């Protein structure tokens, strides 16, 4: 490369080195009490939240959660970079497990000597050659250090939204400007309650009158009634979820509640995702009942059972994931 331009593209969220990292290394080398708490403090400061850690011989194993980086590869890299700065020299291998909803996503085993050597030269591709990626089943009993998390934990935000109806004999466009309150309550590990509540600020639905005369079950065709009668305070989502990772490559979910604006449901899903393969297979089944038009807690008479088989295929060259689904949908 004869160009004067730096071949590494700068990131907007660049890594900030830890101040006095040499002093932190000395303290971390005294005993595991300081080693674990150093990892907890400095990872948490970078929004990489340590869930568990253990040192065995020359290996430091950590499990972390995060929602800051969209790239899980970058997040794991930031964990490795942080640990490399603050861990004593006796640690030769990092075993880093990414965790989501108390389920293991993947584990990266990193040879520290190779990582440190190539990282300093910005040879990231060479550094990655000595990283082993494996499927993971997050097991708390494997770890010596497990910082206590105080539950429940509540995340929420208020944001604007627009509901739209485009095309039709009543007019080309009808819209509803709304305020939405979104909430996620972590009741405990693996158990969450999702909720979305909204209310109208301004709409022009008064002239929207088009009704459906379909002979098929009205699972979606009553959209006009939902738009008009749900203009005031409506519960768009109120769903309890339980996630599990019973074995490597296998993930499960059980859900119940007001699963969307038109239907309540109870059911579950299973996803088989072989770690080193480019495909995944999912099965889901739900008992669904149609909600009232006001979108509160009432229901209509229509109910059905849905079941889907899903196949996911990832094409690595163009980074495209194809989804094929078949089964019984809401209308049969």
Specify the residue positions occupied by each region the protein language model found:
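Feature captures outer-membrane beta-barrel proteins of Gram-negative bacteria and organelles
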Residues: 1-6, 177-187, 236-246, 265-285, ...
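Exposed, low-structure sequence patches enriched in small/polar residues
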Residues: 34-41, 45-47, 55-61, 247, ...
């Amino acid at each position: 490369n004869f160009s004067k331009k730096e071949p590494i593209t700068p990131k907007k969220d660049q890594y900030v080195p830890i101040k006095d990292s040499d002093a932190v290394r000395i303290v971390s080398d005294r005993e595991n009490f300081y080693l674990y708490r150093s990892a907890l403090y400095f990872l948490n400061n970078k929004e990489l939240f340590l869930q568990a850690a253990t040192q065995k011989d020359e290996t430091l194993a950590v499990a972390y959660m995060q929602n800051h980086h969209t790239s899980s590869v970058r997040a794991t890299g930031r964990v490795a970079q942080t640990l490399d700065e603050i861990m004593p020299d006796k640690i030769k291998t990092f075993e880093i497990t990414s965790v989501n909803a108390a389920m293991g996503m993947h584990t990266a085993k990193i040879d520290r000597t190779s990582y440190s050597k190539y990282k300093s030269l910005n040879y990231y591709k060479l550094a990655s050659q000595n990283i082993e990626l494996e499927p993971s089943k997050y097991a708390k009993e494997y770890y010596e250090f497990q910082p206590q998390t105080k539950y429940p934990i509540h995340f929420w935000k208020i944001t604007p939204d627009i509901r739209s109806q485009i095309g039709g004999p009543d007019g080309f466009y009808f819209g509803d400007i709304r305020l939405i309150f979104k909430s996620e309550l972590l009741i405990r590990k693996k158990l969450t309650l999702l909720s979305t509540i909204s209310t109208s600020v301004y709409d022009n639905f008064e002239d929207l009158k088009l009704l459906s005369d379909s002979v098929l079950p009205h699972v979606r065709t009553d959209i006009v009634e939902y738009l008009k009668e749900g203009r005031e305070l409506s519960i768009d989502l109120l769903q309890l979820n339980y996630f599990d990772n019973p074995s490597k490559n296998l993930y499960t979910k059980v859900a119940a509640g007001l699963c969307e604006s038109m239907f309540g449901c109870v059911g579950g899903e299973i996803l088989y995702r072989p770690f080193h393969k480019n495909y995944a297979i999912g099965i889901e089944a739900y008992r669904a009942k149609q909600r009232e038009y006001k979108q509160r807690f009432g229901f209509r008479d229509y109910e059905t059972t849905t079941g889907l088989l899903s196949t996911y295929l990832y094409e690595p060259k163009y980074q495209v994931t194809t989804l094929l689904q078949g089964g019984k949908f809401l209308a049969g």
